[in-house]
């Protein structure tokens, strides 16, 4: 996870656990740490309703970056989103923001710790979503959001081409 100055902190990093079954996996964290312009993980939400998706994400990341006080998101990705979320009696600001890199979400925690996640579209086919999660999780180097956007576009184009062949 990143500190305000862009450096990474190992403290609070998630412990390595047995991987979730592939068909159930919705979140992957970078094992390579992070760097400027790179993501800390990838997330494949089940819907485009940020209000229903955010509570679980906040609960998970609060353990790693401290109490989350603000979430910024790319409004293009979500059909509906709350302006705030209440967790344990505290308000969390949820703000649309034209992110530097599309298809990302930022979580701001305590002590200037943040997490930036690449968001795989909820409607993405499972095979593409899992390839994106694997790319982030298995990379030996931090992965830039721009690289993920490019790879997602390539995988989507390949899937569309295969679908056209199957339709013939």
Say what each PLM segment does:
Residues 44-85:
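Short, well-structured hydrophobic secondary-structure segments
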Residues 3, 79-168:
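Helix-rich interaction surfaces within compact, conserved domain-sized segments
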Residues 9-38:
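N-terminal, Lys/Arg- and Ser/Thr-rich interaction peptides
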Residues 1-11:
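N-terminal secretory-pathway/extracellular module detecting exported/lumenal segments
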Residues 31, 55, 163-164:
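N- and C-terminal low-complexity/disordered segments
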Residues 31, 75, 109-111:
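Short acidic, glycine-rich loop/turn motifs
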Residues 39-43:
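Short hinge/gating elements
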């Amino acid at each position: 996870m990143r500190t305000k100055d862009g450096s990474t902190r190992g403290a609070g990093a998630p412990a390595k656990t047995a991987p979730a079954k592939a068909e159930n996996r919705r979140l992957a964290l970078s094992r390579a740490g992070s760097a400027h312009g790179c993501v800390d993980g990838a997330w494949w939400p089940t819907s485009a309703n940020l209000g229903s998706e955010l509570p679980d994400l906040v609960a998970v990341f609060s353990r790693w970056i401290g109490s989350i006080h603000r979430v910024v998101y790319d409004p293009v990705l979500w059909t509906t989103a709350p302006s705030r979320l209440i967790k344990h009696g505290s308000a969390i600001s949820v703000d649309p923001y034209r992110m530097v890199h599309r298809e990302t979400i930022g979580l701001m925690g305590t002590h200037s710790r943040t997490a930036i996640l690449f968001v795989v579209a909820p409607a993405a086919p499972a095979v593409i979503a899992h390839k994106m999660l694997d790319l982030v999780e298995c990379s030996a180097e931090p992965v830039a959001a721009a690289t993920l956007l490019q790879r997602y576009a390539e995988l989507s184009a390949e899937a569309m081409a295969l679908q056209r062949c199957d339709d013939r």
